[in-house]
């Protein structure tokens, strides 16, 4: 089905759907299930090193999200498998008059598995509304590193905040033999028309926002302090928080404000790079997209 088609789903039309399952086979992580329909797909898998971690690049052939577009992404990383999931380019949200573009993502991580979710930046243009809802379920022994950068798109008068709304909601659950427990509800809502988001107490005069979420049994206050020190080397305003510990697993949320996409990407990359090297003996990510 081509990128201009729409797919029926209950309350509305689905612009694109992607399902990806990854398992461990012969010492390497490989796709166990792969399905795409409409305006989403993945490129051929790649391996950046000898760790066995598989990398996939998500592609939206249409290049942008428009009003009433709905994209569905379903990812499963099976026991002991490792997945790096990124995008080919920035996610661009254009005018969405009378509606909003939406992405819904469901992620399940099995025992001893790991996922690095490292998309390119989200760019919200003039009069754009965008909602992103993610539900992530982890085994207590699995590991998640998830980064996100939000930037305002160009507008004719040069002002930064001309989009209508950006709403990012992450539900993170720990699921074991005793059932699922909510570890974190990370809800970010920016509505420029309803107030001065550039002022003190919200964006602190900055225009770009970066977020890093880490969930792992090795997350603790010492790690949070270390990442905070790393963040101070960048031209950004950064805060850090820890979740409660559930079944031995803890979450960390880092938020950074800056006026530069590159600065935020470098900051988040530096923090993720420390974890890759320490936990898995891997080099910092170099996805060579540019």
From Swiss-Prot:
Pfam families: UreD
Domain of life: Bacteria
Keywords: Chaperone, Cytoplasm, Nickel insertion
Single GO MF descriptor: nickel cation binding
Gene Ontology cellular-component annotations: cytoplasm
Keyword DNA repair attributed: no
Compartments, record wording: Cytoplasm
Main location: cytoplasm
This protein's record includes keyword Transcription regulation: no
Coiled coil: none
Purpose: Required for maturation of urease via the functional incorporation of the urease nickel metallocenter.
SUBUNIT field: UreD, UreF and UreG form a complex that acts as a GTP-hydrolysis-dependent molecular chaperone, activating the urease apoprotein by helping to assemble the nickel containing metallocenter of UreC. The UreE protein probably delivers the nickel.
Recorded family membership: Belongs to the UreD family.
Entry protein name: Urease accessory protein UreD
Organism whose genome encodes this protein: Paenarthrobacter aurescens (strain TC1)
Native organism taxonomy: Bacteria, Bacillati, Actinomycetota, Actinomycetes, Micrococcales
Gene label: ureD
